[in-house]
Amino acid sequence: MKPIFRRVAVIGKYPGPGAVSASDSARQIIESIAQFVTQQDCELTLEAETAAHTGLTQYHTLDVEGIGRQCDLCLVVGGDGTMLGVGRRLAGYGTPLVGINQGRLGFITDIPLEGYQDALTPILHGDYEEDVRPLMQACVMRSGECVFEALALNDVVVNRGSTSGMVELRVEVDGVFVSNQRADGLIVASPTGSTAYALSAGGPMLHPSIPGWVLVPIAPHTLSNRPIVLSDATEVAIEVAGGRDISANFDMQSLASLQHGDRILVRRSAHRVCFLHPRGWSYFATLRKKLGWYEGGS
């Protein structure tokens, strides 16, 4: 039986310079997956930096954007952070992603590295669960001009520096004033990001099918300042009204330094990310496994 995905790319997490043993391990993992994919009668492409850092230069290579233009499927080897970065860069191309977990928790990179072949074979032949996640589009407005913009799959976070005091943030939703918040910061999280930083700050978990966001204050000065669930059709504006050493980050990977009066606008992006999971995948099973929920009977 021929695979339905003919051109398959692999993007891997690789260690920094000097980590020899980790580099050898990364090479072995990527090479094993590459060989497996070619054995499935697929045309393999390695992401260029992955190939360079692992020394696997015998394979066809493309940069991430080239993968988006030319490949039918992308296998991401690493943790959720790796998947977030790849997902944002490929969102505009509609390339489906499969995560092979080489990290720790693995909410969206859900296929274990050990035994990945058993999970991956049916997916390559068209037997999978599709899971589409929305992205957020954010920009930093300064004196009426956008000075920084980024996509986020998990969250947009405005917070204070490590040695500064609380920040004061004016929050509006669709142009309607909500509150002035004094806190360590504020999180705007998607359903995907609701199990990340927002959860540790006391926010609720949103099912991926819910078209919403959650607005979560970080250590607020007023204890009645609680998380709010919003429609993702709204535009959230966060204005820096007070404080110093303030920044905005997007999926904890892109960072913008903020000034007094800056406004961060967050709206739903036109782009989405499509994850493919093994048949039988369940969001609730993922929560039980990753969060250690009790599974016993009465």
UniProtKB/Swiss-Prot annotation:
Molecular function, one GO term: metal ion binding
Key word NAD present: yes
Domain of life the protein comes from: Bacteria
First-level EC class: transferase
Cytoplasm keyword on record: yes
Keywords assigned by UniProt, alphabetized: ATP-binding, Cytoplasm, Kinase, NAD, NADP, Nucleotide-binding, Transferase
Cofactor dependence: a divalent metal cation
EC number: 2.7.1.23
GO biological process: NAD metabolic process; NADP biosynthetic process
The reaction(s) this protein catalyses: NAD(+) + ATP = ADP + NADP(+) + H(+)
Protein location: Cytoplasm
Catalytic machinery residues: D80
A GO-annotated cellular component: cytoplasm
Coiled coil: none
Binding site for NAD(+): D80, G81, N154, D155, R182, D184, T195, A196, Y197, A198, L199, S200, A219, Q253
Family affiliation: Belongs to the NAD kinase family.
Function text: Involved in the regulation of the intracellular balance of NAD and NADP, and is a key enzyme in the biosynthesis of NADP. Catalyzes specifically the phosphorylation on 2'-hydroxyl of the adenosine moiety of NAD to yield NADP.
Protein name: NAD kinase
Lineage start: Bacteria, Pseudomonadati, Pseudomonadota, Betaproteobacteria, Burkholderiales
Protein's gene: nadK
